[in-house]
Amino acid sequence: MSSKNYLRVIGPPLALIAIAALSIPAGASSSSSGAVQSARAFAAGQSLNVGPKPAAAPARWLGLIGEYGPDDNVLIIFEEDGTLRAHFKSANRERLNEVSRDVFKMATSAPGYDVLTFSRDPHGRATQVTVDGRPLKRRNIEPEAGANQLRVKPLRPVPELMKEALNAKPPEEQGDFRPADLVELTKLDPSIRLEIRYATTNNFLGTVFYSEPRAFMQRPAAEAVVRANAKLKQYGYGLLIHDAYRPWYVTKVFWDATPDDKKIFVANPANGSRHNRGCAVDLTLYDLKTRQPIEMVSTYDETTARAYPDYPGGTSRQRWHRRLLRAAMESEGFTVYEAEWWHFDYQDWKLYRIGNVAFDRIPTTNR
């Protein structure tokens, strides 16, 4: 897997103009309808400064987009503003001119990179690109066709790790913390949708971790998510939640199960995670008309370079959707995690203790 340094070659992340966080008035959180109405009122007319939605990439190019070549000189093929482009060590966002089907020529000559010829499988997906006579195999880092989740082989059996985690205790913390006030997101705003992967086997470890498909956050963070969701409606989108509050014992299983080279994608239980504190959320966009999730540059919980929020690959539209999500969340006091475009931490996370309460033991008044 590529490192952060590999991604930094392409420059800093796209700058986003954040909108000042707006507070829901006192009492607005006392009911679902009150929170939603207040959020919608604040969101009216608020632009997220992400520019117009790009046109869809030409269908004939979709099977070509991806990574090719060895680890030390990765060639990324992506679409930008209606053109196919290449990124590699000696060129950044190099435009490719289409000569014929699957044959492209560099717009400006780069040593060893002039003509690119793609080879496809029977399904239309490129398996390699030949660059001036040198074949570069496709790097199959993404899920296979039809799949939406990459798997990680656990270092030890998950049931064994789960038993150990349930018997372990979170680290001791000293400080003046706020009392926990976990509330259910869908109770504040029913238009927020859920696809809680850890309540299913459709996750990176292929194991059910939650007894219920629910999403809880500390109240200020939850209300901020409601406001972000309201701002997205003018663009035709809503928020789809994959995970929110996560008991500490689950974080311990993730850490103990994950190989060292992929531990950047999981939190160290010795420190606890922001999910454990009820101030982190994993989410994406869904289309308000079709009710379907929006396709992003990578899949959720993908342990590859494609998961980074500044990864240059994919299509213009995929990156625009990623940028829109980030702008909405940052405008409400969240910060994106450097290795996961879907993970956002709320600004007050340090004010809450690590939590280890299972969903079915959260006070019913907050559920």
Which positions does each model-derived feature cover?
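Short, well-ordered surface patches within globular domains
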Residues: 250
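Short active-site loop/helix that positions an aromatic residue
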Residues: 253-255
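Extracytoplasmic cell-surface/polysaccharide-interacting catalytic and binding patches
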Residues: 146-242, 257-339, 348-367
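Bacterial N-terminal signal peptides
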Residues: 11-23
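Bacterial N-terminal signal peptides that target proteins for export
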Residues: 2-14
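Peripheral terminal and inter-domain segments
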Residues: 27-156
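Conserved metal-phosphate-binding beta-hairpin within the catalytic cores
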Residues: 344
